[in-house]
Amino acid sequence: MVFKNKLVKSNNFTPIMLLAQSCALLGFACYATTLLPLQNLWQLSNLQSGLIASAIFLGYMCAVPFATALTDRIDARKIYFVGGLLGFLGLLGMGYLATGFWSAVVFMVICGAGLAGTYMPGLKILSDRLQQVELSRHISFYTAFFGIGTGFSYMLSGWILEAQDWQAVYRWIALGPLTAMLIVLFFIPPLKPVAGLSGLNLHWRDLFPVKTWRIVLHNRDAAGYIFGYTTHSLELFASRSWLVAFFGFCALASGSDFFLAITTLAGIINFFGVPASIIGNEIALRVGRKNWISFVMLGSAVAGIALATASGQAWWLIVSLAIAHAILIMADSATLTAGLVMSAPANIKGAAMGLHSLMGFGGGLLGPAIFGFVLDLTGSRSSADAWVWAYGAIVIWGVLFVMYEKRQGWSRKR
């Protein structure tokens, strides 16, 4: 690294980074909120709608190797500035220039690149400024606050959509990542550079450090956390991308409206993931991370199928099952990330975090598209059975992961 790791008290910076992350994520659910009006306006299939939702993860995957490789060489604070700017520009492009499928994909890719420049670099900002003994709990708070940002994203986007139109959603929410950038600029001091080291000297092997990734994957603990995070992210982001549309179908199927706007409900449900992630990490520290992850993934699969089969039922049952599913999806989120950070060797921690994030958001890339493809394949949005198949297509991966790792003996270790 090209900077001195001067450790400071965590309570100086953790709340600041939690606030910044919440602002940076305000654009995350804009498309999920506007999916239905844009699908009708642009005459999109469910697969196309899912691909636009997946585009943010494509942008993330393209940018995250560069962003995380740089955090091992320069202060992650600088990467954060670039990420905030890209998020701002991507949302503005959606609000002013998007006219159909391909233009929306382009701007969502830019938004994803912005997320790559803020999410894991934001975690690196914290890890460079914390004592090792503090990391696990503060990581759990940081990852849990992903739900705060996405929850407010649903709510604010829904309120703006109801008051104005879909374009206004992106134009106003673009202020979120810009604000995150300014928070880090003014409230997070830079790390002190080490004298005598200059130049980035980045090569493709630095951006895609395959040899280093192989070292990481040869560590059974690290590999398990990474693949677990991939299946977790596939289910999580598919569910978040299609939850508003599913609630819309449920309202039609049951013949009655929900007690709140469906976008507001989606936001509130996301908030349940925050304590779930934090408390889940505390439970994992007591019962063993791997045992907890296995239990949560199986429970999440059951809750997801139960939610999908309840589409014609009363709103209170649907909302209760959606909350249960959200809690179980997020209950192992911090545990998976903390486990990876704690198990990765210090000299390749940045690369390990990059692979973890790359694989996780690779799952996020696949999830919404798989969900939309299965909807088209089995009857489209108007079929209750199609929603069951679509949910089944995303929860099955966690079950397969648990079965595989149990066979390999991973779940019997702490």
Protein language model regions, located:
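Helix-loop-helix hairpin linking two adjacent transmembrane segments in secondary transporters
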Residues: Y142-P189
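Extracytoplasmic gate region of multi-pass secondary transporters
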Residues: Y31-A32, D221-I269
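Cytoplasmic helix-loop-helix junction between adjacent transmembrane helices
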Residues: F107-F145
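Multi-pass alpha-helical transporter architecture, strongest
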Residues: L182-F187, S380, W387-R414
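Flexible cytoplasmic inter-helical loops of multi-pass small-molecule transporters
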Residues: I188-R214, R414
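C-terminal transmembrane helical hairpin of 12-TM major facilitator-type secondary transporters
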Residues: K290-L336
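Helix-to-loop junctions at the C-terminal end of transmembrane segments
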Residues: A63-D75, A276-R289, L375
